[in-house]
Regions:
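Short, small-residue-rich loop/turn micro-motifs
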Residues: 6-10, 79-82, 155
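Disulfide-bonded cysteines in secreted/extracellular proteins and peptides
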Residues: 10, 157, 191-194
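A structural signal for short, well-ordered beta-strand segments and their strand-loop junctions
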Residues: 4-5, 150-152
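Thiamine diphosphate
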Residues: 15-150, 158-164
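Acidic-glycine-rich active-site phosphate/pyrophosphate-binding loop
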Residues: 2-17
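Ferredoxin-like iron-sulfur electron-transfer modules
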Residues: 127-136, 165-196
């Protein structure tokens, strides 16, 4: 098994059933830092750690990415990039893709990571493409390249997307324009009852 570590954030829910993925949790931006002890040269498997984009900018760039480079850690770091600091309410951050009149946004996480000295960086633009995510993780876990392997996994936070689109849909409906409302449900022929 791989040691899996997270910081606090929505991705931390993976430690709960039915997935139960995770061994350690540390503060905002510190998932990769908490995995550093498991990245020794004699480790049989690479650790996997998660940090959200809010935590990445808050503390993770220096405490997690910078230290992984400095200590030549050989683990896999996944930056969950949902375009906002979703864990604290959806505020814009440096890498937010929204136009913000009073803040500077649209600074790519990948560029900051490369600027810290990470050479193995992959960016998945649509994390709902499970095959692409799986392939990136497999490559990160099996590559011969030493040093930290960082995957930036980008997809917009669905809560913030709903908040962003709701007023636009309301206005369009008020103007008499036709609107499509996406609905989700459970396919009882496929569902295993695991609440995933």
């Amino acid at each position: 098994k791989h040691h899996i570590a997270s910081d606090i954030g929505c991705h931390l829910f993976s430690i709960m059933p039915p997935f139960e993925l995770g061994a350690t949790t540390m503060g905002y931006g510190l998932g990769p830092a908490s995995a550093s002890a498991f990245n020794s040269p004699d480790a049989k498997r690479r650790s996997i750690s998660f940090v959200g984009d809010g935590g990445f900018w808050h503390n993770g760039l220096t405490s997690s990415i910078g230290n992984a480079v400095f200590n030549r850690n050989d683990g896999v770091i996944v930056v969950v990039d949902n375009f906002y600091s979703a864990a604290t309410g959806g505020q814009d951050i440096l890498s937010s893709r929204a136009d913000n009149r009073s803040k500077s946004t649209r600074h790519p996480i990948t560029e900051a990571i490369k600027g810290m000295g990470v050479t193995w960086v992959r960016h998945i633009e649509r994390t709902y493409d499970v095959g692409q995510m799986r392939a990136a993780l497999k490559e990160a876990l099996t590559t011969e390249e030493k040093g930290p392997k960082v995957i930036v996994a980008s997809s917009e936070c669905m809560l913030n997307r709903q908040r962003r689109e709701a007023p636009l849909k309301k206005q369009a409906a008020a103007e008499g324009r036709r609107m499509v409302k996406t609905k989700f449900g459970v396919d009882e022929d496929v569902c295993t009852g695991d609440h995933a």
